[in-house]
């Protein structure tokens, strides 16, 4: 059964900053491999890390805090995060590719808060490690299967991965779960996958999933979708495989009625856009 997410369809103007060519983002990029820059937040959520803690997070993973130039290089190939984070030398900012009224003050580029005199301020972190293990990426292919790190083996502790799917204007994304096995807890607070009907993990929250019950299919309202995978420091499990295919505007599969079985899924926390 398919959960149709009813929102206003996202209509974007073509922007060179996304790397668009003829209306499509023309290259699929593993952000960690292409630029070495990735976003990290505290286990307890956004904006919880002091400068010293942010440095420690990056160094624990074999990297270091990204410089302004490294973050800008990542931004130029599509790295977009609507969350301010520490950089090297005590600088704070975040990369914006597509301007929006709710993020980046309608601007593109690095939204720069400058070098902070108070290193006890709490933000996220932008780390740099060109040898980081693949975990997340940007997909623009019409269809693809992607997996949790190490699948079919168990994923590691302390993972935070982001996948961004971006298709042609007017197309939608049909997401299907092929395998799903994460640590279970009633609130999905330990290990989980979150899905967002947007190009970041701030807007369009669909839901949070954990346990071993296969989630329902999901169809986006627009041509973008974001998935976030997080694991804690204790129990691991088998991981997941997720498939997406492109839904063209005239496709019948995108015209069905919205029917939801959220109430029957004990391993699901609903977002405001998951059902009517």
Curated annotation (Swiss-Prot):
Tissue distribution of the protein: Vascular smooth muscle cells.
Primary subcellular site in the record, as a coarse category: secreted
Enzyme class: hydrolase
Residues that bind Ca(2+): 183, 191, 232, 234-235
SUPFAM superfamilies: C-type lectin-like (SSF56436), Spermadhesin, CUB domain (SSF49854)
Keyword annotations from UniProtKB, A to Z: Calcium, Cell adhesion, Disulfide bond, Glycoprotein, Hydrolase, Metal-binding, Secreted, Signal
Domain Link: 36-129
Alphabetized PANTHER family for the sequence: CUBILIN-LIKE PROTEIN, TUMOR NECROSIS FACTOR-INDUCIBLE GENE 6 PROTEIN
Domain comment as written in the entry: The Link domain interacts with various extracellular matrix components, including heparin, heparan sulfates, hyaluronan and I-alpha-I complex. It is required for binding to various chemokines. The CUB domain is necessary for calcium ion binding and transesterification reaction. It is required for binding to FN1.
Protein name: Tumor necrosis factor-inducible gene 6 protein
Organism taxonomic ancestry: Eukaryota, Metazoa, Chordata, Craniata, Vertebrata
Gene it is expressed from: TNFAIP6
